[in-house]
Regions:
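Non-catalytic accessory segments flanking enzymatic or RNA/DNA-binding domains
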Residues: 1-101
Length: 101
């Protein structure tokens, strides 16, 4: 079975913002290096990442984006003005359902 990763990222230079994203890479380090190379002044930190079926990755990411849409900073970006704990609660619940969202 193929897997993807749904993750939460924070950055000390962006307090109060959480990036909710996904990757089909095999590890988070690759994704975090890629994001750091996009002009962010310090590397992202990953307080949570969850390996899920690749076919569910985008669905789970979309469900999280929808759940936090009122707190979305920019419609074209995956950053939300929320606490990590808020995203963790919903993320863990959605990921544990083992059903298509």
């Amino acid at each position: 079975m193929e897997y993807g990763i749904v993750y939460l990222l924070t950055n000390p230079v962006m307090p109060g913002l959480v990036k909710i994203g996904m990757t089909t890479r095999e590890d988070m380090d690759s994704r975090m290096r890629e994001l750091y190379s996009t002009g962010v002044s310090v590397p992202f930190e990953c307080p949570f990442a969850c390996r899920v079926k690749k076919s569910d990755c985008a669905k789970i990411e979309k469900a999280l984006h929808t759940a936090f849409s009122p707190q979305r900073v920019n419609a074209n970006r995956e950053f939300f003005r929320i606490q990590v704990e808020q995203a963790l609660g919903i993320h863990v619940h959605i990921a544990s359902l083992r059903i298509s969202v």
